[in-house]
C-alpha cells in the first residue's frame, strides 16, 4: 500500500463545507479492499452511506456476503437498489455502527470476517442544504445524521456558554471558542439562531481567516457542533469494541478517518490491542498489567491517499486508513482511556481565547 507525506489537515471529513458540490466518492477504496482481503465469508460495512465500499467489496469477491449499517434513513432508502442488484448477497440494517454487534445478533449473525468503518459525515449529507451540515448553502441548523434527537439549533440556542465553548474547542479544535460562544449567546438574546448562514456569519465575525488559507472561519465550529450532536467520537469508540467482539480470529478491521480526533482514537485502540502501548505501570497498585493482544497490525502506520486521488477528489486529502487483524485472544475489557478521549474533559481550562 502506498503512503505519502500527509497534507496539512484543513477540515472535517471530506472537506465538503467549502468545496463545490460533488458526488460522493469513497476514499482509499482500493487500499481498503486490499487491507480487508477477499476470501469469502461475511463483511460488515458499518457506515454504508452511498454504498461505495459495499459495492467494491461485492465486486471484488463474488463469494462475499455483506451486511451494511447506517443510521441515516436516507442512506438506507437509497441502498435498496443495490440490495436488489446484489442477488441476495447484501443486507441493509438501520442503526448506529456503535451498536453493530447487537444489530448483527438481532439478524442472527454471531461472527464476521471483515468490518470497514468510514467515520464522519458523508458528502451526500454535506451537500444537502436541508440537512444543515454545511455553511456553503443556507439551510436549517440541523446536523443530525439519524434525523432524531436534539439538533444543532437546539444545542446552539439552549446550551450555556461554557458548554458551547468546550464543545467548539475540544471537538472543533477552534482556539477562539470562547469568543464564538460569547457571540452566540449575545445573538440568541435577540432571537433564535435557526439557519446555517446565521451561525456562519456570527462565527466569521470573530474568527479571522489565516493569511493564505482557503478554510472558511466557521469550519471548526461546525465540526465541533456536528460531532457533539451525533456523539461521533463516542460512536467510534463503541464501534471499535463492537468490531473486536464480532470478528473471527483472522478477521480484519479497516477504519478510515478524516481528522485528528478520530485518528487518535483509532491509533490508540490498535496500539493498545496489539501490545504497542503500555497497559499498566510499575508505579500503580499491582504493577504492569499483562497485555492481551486481540489485534495484530495490517497497516504499518496510516495509509494516506496519493496525489492522483487527492487531485481527483480534494475531499480525500485528510483521510487516513488504519487496519488490523483479529487474533485468537479473548476479548479484553473495553479501554476506558478511549472513552475519555471521546468525551469533553471535566475541566477544560486555560487555553481558549
UniProtKB/Swiss-Prot annotation:
Main location: cytoplasm
Presence of the UniProt keyword Nucleotide-binding in the record: no
MF terms (GO), sorted A to Z: rRNA (cytosine-N4-)-methyltransferase activity
Keywords: Cytoplasm, Methyltransferase, rRNA processing, S-adenosyl-L-methionine, Transferase
GO biological process: rRNA base methylation
InterPro entries per UniProt: RsmH (IPR002903), SAM-dep_MeTrfase_MraW_recog (IPR023397), SAM-dependent_MTases_sf (IPR029063)
Subcellular localization, as worded in the UniProt entry: Cytoplasm
Cell wall biogenesis/degradation among keywords: no
Enzyme Commission numbers on file: 2.1.1.199
Superkingdom of origin organism: Bacteria
Residue sites binding S-adenosyl-L-methionine per the record: 51-53, 70, 97, 118, 125
GO cellular component: cytoplasm
Annotated stretches, region: Disordered: 1-23, 276-334
Similarity comment: Belongs to the methyltransferase superfamily. RsmH family.
Protein name stated in the entry: Ribosomal RNA small subunit methyltransferase H
Function: Specifically methylates the N4 position of cytidine in position 1402 (C1402) of 16S rRNA.
Record field: catalytic activity: cytidine(1402) in 16S rRNA + S-adenosyl-L-methionine = N(4)-methylcytidine(1402) in 16S rRNA + S-adenosyl-L-homocysteine + H(+)
Amino acid at each position: 500500500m502506498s503512503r505519502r507525506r500527509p497534507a496539512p489537515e484543513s477540515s472535517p471529513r471530506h472537506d465538503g463545507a467549502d468545496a463545490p458540490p460533488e458526488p460522493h466518492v469513497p476514499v482509499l477504496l482500493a487500499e481498503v479492499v486490499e487491507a480487508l482481503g477477499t476470501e469469502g465469508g461475511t463483511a460488515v460495512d458499518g457506515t454504508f452511506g452511498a454504498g461505495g465500499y459495499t459495492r467494491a467489496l461485492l465486486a471484488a469477491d463474488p463469494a462475499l456476503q455483506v451486511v451494511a449499517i447506517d443510521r441515516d434513513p436516507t442512506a438506507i432508502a437509497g441502498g435498496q437498489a443495490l440490495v436488489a442488484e446484489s442477488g441476495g448477497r447484501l443486507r441493509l440494517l438501520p442503526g448506529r455502527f456503535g451498536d453493530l454487534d447487537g444489530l448483527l445478533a438481532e439478524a442472527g449473525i454471531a461472527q464476521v470476517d471483515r468490518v470497514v468503518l468510514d467515520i464522519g459525515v458523508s458528502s451526500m449529507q454535506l451537500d444537502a442544504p436541508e440537512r444543515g451540515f454545511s455553511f456553503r448553502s443556507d439551510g436549517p441548523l440541523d446536523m443530525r445524521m439519524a434525523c432524531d434527537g436534539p439538533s444543532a439549533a437546539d444545542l446552539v440556542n439552549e446550551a450555556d456558554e461554557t458548554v458551547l465553548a468546550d464543545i467548539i474547542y475540544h471537538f472543533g479544535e477552534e482556539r477562539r471558542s470562547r469568543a464564538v460562544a460569547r457571540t452566540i449567546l449575545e445573538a440568541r438574546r435577540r432571537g433564535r439562531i435557526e439557519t446555517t448562514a446565521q451561525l456562519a456569519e456570527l462565527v466569521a465575525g470573530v474568527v479571522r481567516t489565516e493569511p493564505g488559507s482557503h478554510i472558511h472561519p466557521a469550519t471548526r465550529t461546525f465540526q465541533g457542533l456536528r460531532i457533539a450532536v451525533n456523539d461521533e467520537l463516542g460512536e467510534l469508540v463503541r464501534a471499535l469494541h463492537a468490531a473486536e467482539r464480532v470478528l473471527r480470529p483472522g478477521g480484519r478491521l479497516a477504519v478510515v478517518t478524516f481528522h485528528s480526533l478520530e485518528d487518535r482514537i483509532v491509533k490508540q485502540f490498535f496500539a493498545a490491542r496489539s501490545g504497542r502501548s503500555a497497559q499498566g505501570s510499575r508505579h500503580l497498585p499491582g504493577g504492569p498489567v499483562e497485555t492481551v493482544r486481540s489485534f495484530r497490525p495490517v497497516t504499518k502506520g496510516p495509509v494516506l491517499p496519493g496525489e492522483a486521488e487527492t487531485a481527483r477528489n480534494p475531499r480525500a486529502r485528510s483521510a487516513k486508513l488504519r487496519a488490523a487483524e483479529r487474533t485468537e485472544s479473548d476479548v479484553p475489557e473495553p479501554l476506558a482511556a478511549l472513552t475519555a478521549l471521546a468525551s469533553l474533559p471535566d475541566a477544560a481550562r486555560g487555553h481558549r481565547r
